[in-house]
Amino acid sequence: MAGVAALVVARWLYTTVSAPPRTAASDAALDSDARAILAAIIPVILEGALPVGSDAAAARDETLAGAREAIAGLPPSVRRELDQLFALLAFAPTRCIVAGVWSPWPDASRESVAAFLGHWRDSRFALLRSAYEAMHQIVLGAWYGNPRSWGAIGYPGPPSLAVG
């Protein structure tokens, strides 16, 4: 446990001391590590909801774009917390120890990502459960905010407000 704490502190120091300052424009974007993490968890969280076949990649990319847009609309303090979460998950030693995902995110198996999400969802630690909920809500909000998903749930779309 002390080793995990040391890794977390080391990663925090690395990101606070050596990370380049973020601008307003870059605050709206997810970095490549965060995009890779979300791209790995989207198919697991949305299993059974995402289309299969050739439409699957496009649906995942649209969901990733929706997540990016949703995160950009969050208050700066929440975006900073998400940045810290994604930095923790992107850093190989903490990804392995805290998430149990041994491969880089783009190469992670569906099973290892599902196990990671399940462990965090059911963790006795409130912080891990909160992190799971944040990722889960971002992905679900991005997917169900996408018109591609509406037909599958019987939602006809927003009503027309046209007068006349």
How should each PLM-predicted stretch be described?
Residues P20-A28, L46, L64, R68-A72:
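Short, charged, low-complexity loops and linkers
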Residues A6-A40:
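C-terminal segment of N-terminal export signals and the immediately downstream linker at the start
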Residues A28-A58:
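Short extracytoplasmic
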Residues M1-T15, S109, M135:
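N-terminal export leaders
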Residues A2-A5, L46, P76, L89-F91:
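Short, amphipathic alpha-helical segments
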Residues I37-A40, A57-G164:
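Mature-region segments of soluble proteins
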Residues V17-S18, R22, A49, A56, ...:
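Proteins with a high burden of low-complexity, intrinsically disordered sequence enriched in S/T/G/P/A and R
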